């Protein structure tokens, strides 16, 4: 509890300085991310949108950019370029998405809002605006309340049980005097996934993406997911967020730094954006791996992360990352609260007991249609050992390279993405299992852990305003531990001192596993944020001596929530 008391005192100290407008954040997976990503690539030289590596996005900030780009587009329709001589081209579907995006973030829209009003409200008081069940938009107070629903059912070939997900909940966001923002989301869930997802839950002793759960009927799970935060400003360029939720660092489908694949966690985040720089400090309270033993207080561990993003040019953004995972018995290491210092130096000063990582990322927008991106993550390495090429176990690193192509081959609203991820054995692991790069029995970065090579291909196509076609192929190879328990470095939860030797570890060492995971989905937006989904998935997994093939078809509806996927 010491970290909670410390953060509370810090918040009390900062609050008196709150002076400028504050915003909530766009939920991860919101359709607005894909749209803003398209705008960034198509406009190419908008340096404000280039700061998109850190997610979730600040609503106020991205609405400002969307309205600015919308004005450029409308000036271009009249033959007038912007001050830099640029024209922005939007398709009819983009125009629809622009209206939808602004409508879903109405509290920050400065232009006309006539199109946001519902023609047929329910009971004359509900859905007065198209996206929100209840909306209050006054001078010093904003509140939006919406239901959450996800119901799908399907069949897996060769499996008699019904595959299903039943999610019900509510979310609310708001502002007080445009100085304090708040958000909360609560869902109750009952789920039975395909057999490989059921096995994943057994292996992890956790439901991917969520926390505590209970068995439900035959092979199902029951879990409650609650998130929430408050947000405000410490100064004109400094935003502060405190709450229980997730974060993501990267431009790809995966992240080798920090993903949103694990459970939510308590965090304090400071984000400073000024001139060509964006600097984020993230302090987190995490849960180490554990065995379910009934009602008992779980141990704590902690993390501190920095990310500095710089616009080197109007089209090129680079970033530096560092993070530290550490365990103290109910005690935060206060030296890691320093927001402007290299953690590796601090770790060495206090005796090197912790798990430090560093990284580099880049993103380049090219030719108004292409984006190239990547990450290099360094856990530990020695250049001499890399040159020796002996497979030294502690050369622990990961690399990501990817590309996005919008309006591919001249087809409007056809967007393609390809991504490669490679992570060496023993990466993210540590000699102290408390200090490994995990949270609540789940990896903090890539869901596969380590010792793998992965290739991802994604197609997104919106042929008409309310129709969405998505396809995704994931193929990976991984070296798993032997059946006799020999540690080949794929499992970040294991003490890395349990390895059999120091040399001879290459990517894929161990039992050879191969996996193909393909999915196609057609969605229709019945009304704002209400979707009907039809999904087909084929997964073929093979490891030495056994294989598991999954053919899955599901159909369902969802409201104000991202579709739950089984992408591992």
Predicted regions, residues:
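Generic structural marker for isolated residues within well-ordered, non-membrane alpha-helices
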Residues: 36, 227, 456
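Bacterial Sec-dependent N-terminal signal peptides
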Residues: 1-24
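Exposed, low-structure sequence patches enriched in small/polar residues
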Residues: 223, 316-324, 329-568
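Active-site-adjacent bridging/hinge elements
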Residues: 36-39, 238-245, 373, 377, ...
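Outer-membrane beta-barrel channel domains
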Residues: 27-30, 45-53, 58-60, 65-317, ...
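Short N-terminal segments immediately surrounding and downstream of signal-peptide cleavage
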Residues: 23-40
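Short, charged, low-hydrophobicity "junction" segments
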Residues: 8-16, 39, 114-122, 250, ...
């Amino acid at each position: 509890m010491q970290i909670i008391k410390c953060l509370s005192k810090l918040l009390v100290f900062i609050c008196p300085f709150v002076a400028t407008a504050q915003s909530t954040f766009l939920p991860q997976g919101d359709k607005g991310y894909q749209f803003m990503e398209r705008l960034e690539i198509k406009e190419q030289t908008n340096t404000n949108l280039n700061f998109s590596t850190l997610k979730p996005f600040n609503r106020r900030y991205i609405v400002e950019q969307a309205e600015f780009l919308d004005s450029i587009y409308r000036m271009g329709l009249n033959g007038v370029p912007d001050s830099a001589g640029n024209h922005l081209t939007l398709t009819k579907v983009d125009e629809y998405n622009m209206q939808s995006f602004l409508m879903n973030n109405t509290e920050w829209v400065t232009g006309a809002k006539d199109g946001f009003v519902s023609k047929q409200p329910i009971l004359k008081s509900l859905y007065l605006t198209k996206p929100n069940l209840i909306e209050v938009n006054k001078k010093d107070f904003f509140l939006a309340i919406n239901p959450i629903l996800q119901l799908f059912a399907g069949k897996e070939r060769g499996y008699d049980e019904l595959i299903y997900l039943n999610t019900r909940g509510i979310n609310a966001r708001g502002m007080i005097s445009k100085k304090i923002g708040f958000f909360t989301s609560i869902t109750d869930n009952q789920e039975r996934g395909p057999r490989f997802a059921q096995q994943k839950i057994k292996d992890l002793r956790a439901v991917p993406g969520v926390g505590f759960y209970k068995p439900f009927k035959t092979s199902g799970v029951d879990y409650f997911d609650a998130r929430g935060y408050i947000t405000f400003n410490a100064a004109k360029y400094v935003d502060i967020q405190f709450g229980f939720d997730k974060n993501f660092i990267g431009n790809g489908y995966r992240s080798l730094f920090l993903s949103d694949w694990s459970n939510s966690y308590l965090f304090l985040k400071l984000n400073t954006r000024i001139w060509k720089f964006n600097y984020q400090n993230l302090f987190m309270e995490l849960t180490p791996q554990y065995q379910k033993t009934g009602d008992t207080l779980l141990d704590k561990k902690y993390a501190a992360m920095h990310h500095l993003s710089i616009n080197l040019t109007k089209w090129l953004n680079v970033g530096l990352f560092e993070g530290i995972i550490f365990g103290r018995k109910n005690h935060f290491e206060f030296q890691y609260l320093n927001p402007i210092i290299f953690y590796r130096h601090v770790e060495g000063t206090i005796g090197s007991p912790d798990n430090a990582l560093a990284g580099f990322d880049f993103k380049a927008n090219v030719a108004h249609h292409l984006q190239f991106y990547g990450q290099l993550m360094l856990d530990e390495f020695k250049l001499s050992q890399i040159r020796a090429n002996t497979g030294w176990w502690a050369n622990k690193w990961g690399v990501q390279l990817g590309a996005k192509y919008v309006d591919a081959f001249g087809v409007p609203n056809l967007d393609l993405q390809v991504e490669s991820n490679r992570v060496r054995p023993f990466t993210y692991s540590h000699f102290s299992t408390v200090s490994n790069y995990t949270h609540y029995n789940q990896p903090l970065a890539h869901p596969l852990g380590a010792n793998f090579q992965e290739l991802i291909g994604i197609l997104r196509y919106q042929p008409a305003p309310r129709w969405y076609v998505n396809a995704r192929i994931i193929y990976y190879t991984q070296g798993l531990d032997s059946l006799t328990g020999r540690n080949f470095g794929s499992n970040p939860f294991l003490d890395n001192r349990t390895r059999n030797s120091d040399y001879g570890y290459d990517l894929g060492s161990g039992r050879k596993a191969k996996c193909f995971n393909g999915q196609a989905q057609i969605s229709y937006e019945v009304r704002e944020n209400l979707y009907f989904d039809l999904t087909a998935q084929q997964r073929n997994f093979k490891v030495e001596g056994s294989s598991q093939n999954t053919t899955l078809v599901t159909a369902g509806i969802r409201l104000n929530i991202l579709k739950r996927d089984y992408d591992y």
